[in-house]
C-alpha cells in the first residue's frame, strides 16, 4: 500500500515538472530556440543509441552536425532583433550574447569532423563523446546569455563537468587520468571561490541576483565602495581566471592539453575561452561598474603575466600540445586587452574579431596535430622535421595557421592583432600594448622554428616517423582535411577583407 502511494506521488510530481517545463518552453521557447535545437539533437542521439542494436556511426555525426548547423541558422535569422530578457530575468538575448553563441557553435561544428578519424582509430565510444560535446556547447551558450548569478554559476558548471569527462575519455591512458584529476580538483576549487564572490555581491546588493538589479541594489545600500565588493571582485576574478587560464591561473592548462585526447583539447582550447570571455565582459562591466579602476588593474596584471610567461615558456617546449597550451596563455593576454578597453573604443569589437580569427588559427593547427599523430603516434616537435616531403598539403596548411597565430601580414592574425592593439593604444594602454607587441615578436620565433622543421629537406634531419609516414586509407580522412581547409581559408582570406567582419563585430555592442 505504501509503495503504491509513493509511486502515485512520484508520477504526480513528474507530471507537474513536465507540465512546468512544457509551459516554460511554450512561452519562452522562442527566446532560446537555438538551444532547444541542441536539446532536441541530444534527445535524438540518446533515443537512437538506446534503440539501435547496430550502431551506424555516420548517423551520429550527421545528427550532431545538423543540430549545430540548424542552431547557427536560427541565430542568424534572429540577428538584429531587439534585446529581450526572458525566464523572469534569468536569460538575456541580444546581439552581443548571440555573437559569442555563434562562435561557440562554430567551434563545435568544426571540432566534430576533426574528431571522426581519431574516434575510429582509437575505438572511443562515439555516442558519449558527441553527447558531452553538445552538452558542453549548450552550457556555453546558456552562459553567454546568462543574466543572473545563479545561471552564471550553473551554466559553466554544465560546461565544466562535460570538459572533465571529455579530458578523461581515454581511461586507459595514465596521462589522461592525471590531467582529469588536476582539472577536476582545480576546477572545483575555482568554482567554490567564484560562488564565494557571488555571495558577497548578493549580500551587498540587498539580496539581488540579476546583474542590473545588483547595481541598483548597491546604490540603494550604499555598499558599492565597501570592502565586501573588493572581496567579491578578487574572488570573481580568480574564478573566471581559471576558465580563461591566464597566468597565474594557468597551472592546469599544459597538463590537460598534453594528457587529453587531441580533439578534446581542440574543443576546449577555444570554446572555454569564448564562453568565459562573454561572461567576464558582462560581470565586470555591470555588477562591478563602480570598481572599474580596480578590475582594470587586476586584468592588466593578468594580461602582462600571460603575454610574458606564456610566450617565453612556449619557446622551451618539446611537445606540440604543450607548446600550444602556453601559446594559448599568451593569446588570452591579448584578448584581455579588449576586455579592459570595453565598448568605449571598440574594445569588445576588436576582441570578438580576434577571437574569430583565433578559432580558425588554433583549430587548423590542432587538425594538423590530430592528422600527424594518428599516422605517426608522436607529438614531439622534432618529429615533424621534413613533413613537407611526405605531405605538402598538411605542412603548408600548418605553416599558414602558425604564421597567422604569430601575426605575420597579410594573414588574418596580423589584422586581428593590429585592430586589438590599435584599440588598446587609443584607450591609453600604452604599456600593455607595448608588451603585446614585444611578446608577439617572441611568439613568431617559436612558430617559425616549427615551420623550418616542417619544410626541411635534409635527409639527416628527417626523423623515422616522417620517413615511415603514410596517408590514412580511412574514408573519414576527408573530414579532417575539410576542417583544416576551412580553418586555413579563415586564417588567410579575412585579413584581406576586414571591413565586413569589423562592421558585424561593432554591431554586437550592448
UniProtKB/Swiss-Prot annotation:
<feature type="transmembrane region" description="Helical">
    <location>
        <begin position="347"/>
        <end position="367"/>
    </location>
</feature>
<dbReference type="Pfam" id="PF19530">
    <property type="entry name" value="Ndh2_N"/>
</dbReference>
<feature type="transmembrane region" description="Helical">
    <location>
        <begin position="24"/>
        <end position="44"/>
    </location>
</feature>
<keyword id="KW-0812">Transmembrane</keyword>
<comment type="similarity">
    <text>Belongs to the complex I subunit 2 family.</text>
</comment>
<keyword id="KW-0813">Transport</keyword>
<feature type="transmembrane region" description="Helical">
    <location>
        <begin position="395"/>
        <end position="415"/>
    </location>
</feature>
<dbReference type="GO" id="GO:0042773">
    <property type="term" value="P:ATP synthesis coupled electron transport"/>
</dbReference>
<dbReference type="Pfam" id="PF00361">
    <property type="entry name" value="Proton_antipo_M"/>
</dbReference>
<keyword id="KW-0618">Plastoquinone</keyword>
<dbReference type="GO" id="GO:0008137">
    <property type="term" value="F:NADH dehydrogenase (ubiquinone) activity"/>
</dbReference>
<dbReference type="GO" id="GO:0019684">
    <property type="term" value="P:photosynthesis, light reaction"/>
</dbReference>
<dbReference type="GO" id="GO:0048038">
    <property type="term" value="F:quinone binding"/>
</dbReference>
<comment type="function">
    <text>NDH shuttles electrons from NAD(P)H:plastoquinone, via FMN and iron-sulfur (Fe-S) centers, to quinones in the photosynthetic chain and possibly in a chloroplast respiratory chain. The immediate electron acceptor for the enzyme in this species is believed to be plastoquinone. Couples the redox reaction to proton translocation, and thus conserves the redox energy in a proton gradient.</text>
</comment>
<keyword id="KW-0520">NAD</keyword>
<feature type="transmembrane region" description="Helical">
    <location>
        <begin position="183"/>
        <end position="203"/>
    </location>
</feature>
<feature type="transmembrane region" description="Helical">
    <location>
        <begin position="124"/>
        <end position="144"/>
    </location>
</feature>
<dbReference type="GO" id="GO:0009535">
    <property type="term" value="C:chloroplast thylakoid membrane"/>
</dbReference>
<feature type="transmembrane region" description="Helical">
    <location>
        <begin position="323"/>
        <end position="343"/>
    </location>
</feature>
<keyword id="KW-1278">Translocase</keyword>
<keyword id="KW-0874">Quinone</keyword>
<keyword id="KW-0934">Plastid</keyword>
<dbReference type="InterPro" id="IPR045693">
    <property type="entry name" value="Ndh2_N"/>
</dbReference>
<keyword id="KW-1133">Transmembrane helix</keyword>
<feature type="transmembrane region" description="Helical">
    <location>
        <begin position="149"/>
        <end position="169"/>
    </location>
</feature>
<keyword id="KW-0793">Thylakoid</keyword>
<feature type="transmembrane region" description="Helical">
    <location>
        <begin position="99"/>
        <end position="119"/>
    </location>
</feature>
<keyword id="KW-0150">Chloroplast</keyword>
<keyword id="KW-0521">NADP</keyword>
<dbReference type="InterPro" id="IPR001750">
    <property type="entry name" value="ND/Mrp_TM"/>
</dbReference>
<keyword id="KW-0472">Membrane</keyword>
<feature type="transmembrane region" description="Helical">
    <location>
        <begin position="418"/>
        <end position="438"/>
    </location>
</feature>
<feature type="transmembrane region" description="Helical">
    <location>
        <begin position="295"/>
        <end position="315"/>
    </location>
</feature>
<dbReference type="InterPro" id="IPR010096">
    <property type="entry name" value="NADH-Q_OxRdtase_suN/2"/>
</dbReference>
<feature type="transmembrane region" description="Helical">
    <location>
        <begin position="59"/>
        <end position="79"/>
    </location>
</feature>
<protein>
    <recommendedName>
        <fullName>NAD(P)H-quinone oxidoreductase subunit 2, chloroplastic</fullName>
        <ecNumber>7.1.1.-</ecNumber>
    </recommendedName>
</protein>
<comment type="subunit">
    <text>NDH is composed of at least 16 different subunits, 5 of which are encoded in the nucleus.</text>
</comment>
Amino acid at each position: 500500500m505504501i509503495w503504491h502511494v509513493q509511486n502515485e506521488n512520484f508520477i504526480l510530481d513528474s507530471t507537474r515538472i513536465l507540465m512546468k517545463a512544457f509551459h516554460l518552453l511554450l512561452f519562452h521557447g522562442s527566446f532560446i530556440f537555438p538551444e532547444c535545437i541542441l536539446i532536441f539533437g541530444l534527445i535524438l542521439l540518446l533515443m537512437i543509441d538506446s534503440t539501435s542494436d547496430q550502431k551506424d556511426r555516420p548517423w551520429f555525426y550527421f545528427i550532431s552536425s545538423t543540430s549545430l548547423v540548424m542552431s547557427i541558422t536560427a541565430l542568424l535569422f534572429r540577428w538584429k532583433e531587439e534585446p529581450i530578457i526572458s525566464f523572469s530575468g534569468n536569460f538575456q538575448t541580444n546581439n552581443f550574447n548571440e555573437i559569442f553563441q555563434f562562435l561557440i557553435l562554430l567551434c563545435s561544428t568544426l571540432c566534430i569532423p576533426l574528431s571522426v578519424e581519431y574516434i575510429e582509430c582509437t575505438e572511443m565510444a562515439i555516442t558519449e563523446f558527441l553527447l558531452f560535446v553538445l552538452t558542453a556547447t549548450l552550457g556555453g551558450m546558456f552562459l553567454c546569455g546568462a543574466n543572473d548569478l545563479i545561471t552564471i554559476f550553473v551554466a559553466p558548471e554544465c560546461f565544466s563537468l562535460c570538459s572533465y569527462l571529455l579530458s578523461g575519455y581515454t581511461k586507459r591512458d595514465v596521462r589522461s587520468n592525471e590531467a582529469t584529476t588536476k582539472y577536476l580538483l582545480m576546477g572545483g576549487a575555482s568554482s567554490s571561490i567564484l560562488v564565494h564572490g557571488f555571495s558577497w555581491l548578493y549580500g551587498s546588493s540587498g539580496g539581488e541576483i540579476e546583474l542590473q538589479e545588483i547595481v541598483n541594489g548597491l546604490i540603494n545600500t550604499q555598499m558599492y565602495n565597501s570592502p565586501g565588493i573588493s572581496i567579491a571582485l578578487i574572488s570573481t576574478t580568480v574564478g573566471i581566471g581559471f576558465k580563461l587560464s591566464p597566468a597565474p591561473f594557468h597551472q592546469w592548462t599544459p597538463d590537460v592539453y598534453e594528457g587529453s585526447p587531441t580533439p578534446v583539447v581542440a574543443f576546449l582550447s577555444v570554446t572555454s575561452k569564448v564562453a568565459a570571455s562573454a561572461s567576464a565582459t558582462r560581470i565586470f562591466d555591470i555588477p562591478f561598474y563602480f570598481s572599474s579602476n580596480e578590475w582594470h588593474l587586476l586584468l592588466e596584471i593578468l594580461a602582462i603575466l600571460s603575454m610574458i610567461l606564456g610566450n617565453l615558456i612556449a619557446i622551451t617546449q618539446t611537445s606540440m600540445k604543450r607548446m600550444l597550451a602556453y601559446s594559448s596563455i599568451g593569446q588570452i593576454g591579448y584578448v584581455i586587452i579588449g576586455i579592459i578597453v570595453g565598448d568605449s573604443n571598440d574594445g569588445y569589437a576588436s576582441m570578438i574579431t580576434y577571437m574569430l580569427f583565433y578559432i580558425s588559427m588554433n583549430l587548423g593547427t590542432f587538425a594538423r596535430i590530430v592528422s600527424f599523430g594518428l599516422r605517426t603516434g608522436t607529438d614531439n616537435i622534432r618529429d615533424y622535421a621534413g613533413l613537407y616531403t611526405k605531405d605538402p598539403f598538411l605542412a603548408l596548411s600548418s605553416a599558414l595557421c602558425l604564421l597567422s597565430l604569430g601575426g605575420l601580414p597579410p594573414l588574418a592574425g596580423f589584422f586581428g592583432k593590429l585592430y586589438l592593439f590599435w584599440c588598446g593604444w587609443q584607450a591609453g594602454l600604452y604599456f600593455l600594448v607595448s608588451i603585446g607587441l614585444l611578446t608577439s615578436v617572441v611568439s613568431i620565433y617559436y612558430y617559425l622554428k616549427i615551420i623550418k622543421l616542417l619544410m626541411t629537406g635534409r635527409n639527416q634531419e628527417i626523423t623515422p616517423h616522417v620517413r615511415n609516414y603514410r596517408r590514412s586509407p580511412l574514408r573519414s580522412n576527408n573530414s579532417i582535411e575539410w576542417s583544416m581547409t576551412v580553418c586555413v581559408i579563415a586564417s588567410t582570406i579575412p585579413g584581406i577583407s576586414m571591413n565586413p567582419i569589423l562592421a558585424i563585430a561593432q554591431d554586437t555592442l550592448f
